[in-house]
Amino acid sequence: MKTLLSFLLVVSSALAAPPSAKEILESVRLRQAQQELNLQGLIREGATIVPFRLTQTGPLIRYSFTKPDEALQLRLGDNDSRLEEVTREGVEKVTPAQFDHKVRGTAVTYEDLALKFLYWPNARVTGENSISLRNCWKLELKAPNRQSQYSNVWLWVDKEGGALMKLEGYDWNGKLAKRFTVVSGQKIEDRWFLKEMRIEEFDPATGKQRARTYLEIKK
């Protein structure tokens, strides 16, 4: 009887075990790559408003801007992502040296759009939290090299839908550099999608907020 009880406890513990960080990140990438979208959006920072069009066909996501005409497109692969600049001259890959470039002068950088952290191999699940009333897995991701402006990223992933609910990026001195938080969501074609995200940029030296930006998506 004691042996049977011990066995049942082991089985119960195994069944209750959370998914690994690798499994969670794979599900996030899969979810991201399965969407078909054609939406309007804007980046709002103080008096600055940057409208854009968001289109997606499977693993290809494009952010299109005007005045001047320009686009950034993201290709989500199985093992890596590729961010590209699209201009009248053609298509050019965004290099790590350009990761800190700001999108139209806002706090959003090229690296933020590239989603490279979703492919970092050094990742672990550290616990669970509730973000905007959603139950989330909390993950710690460590950069594989210094090509990133972030040494590590804390990520909160919705347990039910695999959506990214919150992200904190830390610089190479371990100081908080940027925080992304989903403020609200919306249903588009029976799927949950981002409606508004708050992006906070911090001064690593003082810890004070340097900029607050909002990214909004409209149906």
Segments (PLM) and residue ranges:
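Sec-dependent N-terminal signal peptides
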Residues: T3-S13
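Flexible, processing/modification-adjacent segments and terminal tails
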Residues: A17-E26, L30-E36, D78-S151, D171-G174
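Extended lipid/amphipathic-ligand handling interfaces
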Residues: V28, R53-Q56, V182-K187
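One face of beta-strands
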Residues: L37-G41, F52, I61-Y63, S151-V153, ...
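N-terminal, post-signal-peptide region of Sec/Tat-exported proteins
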Residues: G41-G77
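A generic structural motif
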Residues: L42-G46, S64-T66, E84-R88, K142-P144, ...
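Gly/Pro-enriched, hydrophobic low-complexity segments
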Residues: R134-K219
